């Protein structure tokens, strides 16, 4: 089987939506029966985004096999059925780390190690490995054409086009076509200069995706085609839309998938986008709306919680309601009090790290518990719910996590000190261990209690969810907390770790150590988020009586 590659680049400005465009195209090709995957190549020096600030980089998306990756991989999984792995994302830092390790081992036999060919060869090897077994691979190059950081990646894909053959490679370039209000027209010059920059590297784009706040007129697309040496039918207008799930249909309506299949000589049926049409219909025709408060510490950049926000929207689709998300800084809860949590139909506390704002989250969990407001805690959101219950119900005054207060009297949350690496070897770690790549990561099995709410929601006794944490519930202090009324609703497959807790005498209070948002999709939703949004809707109705 021959694998075909579509290399996706961006020009003029960043944040054009390369990831969404690539994922949307992949969704169309998948709907034609093709086996599709997507890769993201990030030009930063970090080995992975695991230790990067969420405020700078956005969320870290965790794959089933435990890779900490770029948030674009979340978009990929929400648009296509293929599950991402550590092969689908790598960085300049990872490439240099691998090459330098080989140099130290003597693998290069004394050769002078250079960007070309050693770095570019390493990039090509990883792209080829990630594409094995697929009909079409979309490869998104992070950054903007013209950046110094992305040059090795651009050189590598230029070489791949020559080595694999142009009949099996395509270059798709996203570019900005701005509208100038003073002139009353869109301007194509930035696109022309961006393509000129690509040409100077040796890459002639085959497809141009023209991003604009409005549809790019046919005469302007013809002008772009002429000056950029691209067929007119391969100049695609991609205007701003009110729902990203409309983009597959928008691209298909302009024949992009037909052009690609013809270019790759692929014989496959027409794309059936009925599932996406259903998503769009549900989104556009809600029967009501709810307001959910998300209390976190990175709220100045909503992308820090991208998958959670999307999962809440998916929960809304499954309940035919619009979910309005109110982002609340947990430090504001500390300074202004729980009064700012009024008028919410439900409360969610997502994952996070560090002590800043934790007391505000604990106060939020208490407010939700005492006022019978639906509550969903994720990762740290479970830990603060446990701490709150231990303090205020189980009588463990000043209970805390050793992450925040190492010598606290009641360390109800503590560091997991024994781990297993990718090869199954036992590792012992402490608070002094490296932060990068030292968490419980990836898909883990969880056994659900028969009498639990989550057992009803999932409809099965055993589930698999993705994790990203290094602190866990301290089993040594669990008995008095359970005796006070907290229910352990889920445990790890080996029965060692607490994965889900519930408050039984509460309408809907669920907190989980894993990250259910990573497996939620617009077409399928997720049991926890669907149940949570339903509980919010029911709470709203009770309050209205």
UniProtKB/Swiss-Prot annotation:
Protein residues bound to CTP: 14, 147-149, 187-192, 223
Any one GO CC term of the record: cytosol
Amidoligase domain: annotated span: 1-266
GO MF, one annotated term: metal ion binding
Xref: PROSITE patterns: GATASE_TYPE_1 (PS51273)
Sequence positions that bind Mg(2+): 72, 140
Subunit comment: Homotetramer.
The protein's name in its UniProt record: CTP synthase
């Amino acid at each position: 089987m021959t694998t075909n590659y579509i290399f996706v680049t961006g020009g003029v400005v960043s944040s054009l939506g390369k990831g969404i465009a690539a994922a949307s195209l992949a969704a169309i090709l998948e709907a034609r029966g093709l086996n599709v995957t997507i890769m993201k190549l990030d030009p930063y020096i970090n080995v992975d985004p695991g230790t990067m600030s969420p405020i700078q980089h956005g969320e870290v998306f965790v794959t089933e096999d435990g890779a900490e990756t770029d948030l674009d991989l979340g978009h990929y999984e929400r648009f296509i059925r293929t599950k991402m792995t550590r092969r689908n994302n790598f960085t300049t830092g990872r490439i240099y780390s691998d090459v330098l390790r080989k140099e130290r081992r003597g693998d290069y036999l004394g050769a002078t190690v250079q960007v070309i060919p050693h770095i570019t060869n390493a990039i090509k090897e990883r792209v080829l490995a990630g594409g094995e077994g697929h009909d079409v691979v979309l490869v998104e190059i992070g950054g903007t054409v013209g950046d110094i950081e992305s040059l090795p990646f651009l050189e590598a894909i230029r070489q791949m086009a020559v080595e694999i053959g142009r009949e099996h490679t395509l270059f798709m370039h996203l570019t900005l076509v701005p509208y100038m209000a003073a002139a009353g027209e869109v301007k194509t010059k930035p696109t022309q200069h961006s393509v000129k920059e690509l040409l100077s590297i040796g890459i002639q784009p085959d497809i141009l995706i023209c991003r604009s706040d409005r549809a790019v007129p046919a005469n302007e697309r013809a002008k772009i085609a002429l000056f950029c040496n691209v067929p007119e039918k391969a100049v695609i207008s991609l205007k701003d839309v009110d729902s990203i799930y409309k983009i597959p249909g928008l691209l298909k309506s302009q024949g992009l998938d037909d052009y690609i299949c013809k270019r790759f000589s692929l014989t496959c049926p027409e794309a059936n986008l009925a599932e996406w049409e259903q998503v769009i219909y549900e989104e556009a025709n809600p029967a009501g709306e709810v307001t959910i408060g998300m209390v976190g510490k990175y709220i100045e950049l909503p992308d820090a919680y991208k998958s959670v926000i999307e999962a809440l929207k998916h929960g809304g689709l499954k309940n035919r309601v619009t979910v309005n998300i109110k982002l609340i800084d947990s430090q504001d809860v500390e300074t202004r009090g729980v009064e700012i949590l009024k008028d919410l139909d439900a409360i969610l506390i997502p994952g996070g790290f560090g002590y800043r704002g934790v007391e505000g989250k604990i106060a939020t969990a208490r407010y939700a518990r005492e006022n019978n407001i639906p509550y969903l805690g994720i990762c740290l959101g479970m830990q603060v719910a446990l701490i709150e219950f231990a303090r205020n119900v189980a009588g463990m005054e000043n209970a805390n996590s050793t992450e925040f207060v190492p010598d606290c009297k009641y360390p109800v949350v503590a560091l997991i000190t024994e781990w297993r690496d990718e090869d199954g070897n036992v590792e012992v770690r402490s608070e002094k261990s490296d932060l990068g790549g030292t968490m419980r990561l990836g898909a883990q099995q969880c056994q659900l209690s028969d009498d639990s709410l989550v057992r009803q929601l999932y409809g099965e006794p055993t589930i698999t969810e993705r994790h990203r944490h290094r602190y866990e519930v301290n089993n040594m202090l669990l008995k008095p907390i359970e005796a006070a009324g907290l229910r352990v609703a889920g445990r790890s497959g080996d029965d060692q770790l607490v994965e889900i807790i519930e408050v039984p005498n509460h309408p809907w209070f669920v907190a989980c150590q894993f990250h259910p948002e990573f497996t939620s999709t617009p077409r399928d939703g997720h049991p926890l988020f669907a149940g949570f949004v339903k509980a919010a809707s029911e709470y709203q109705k009770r309050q209205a009586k």
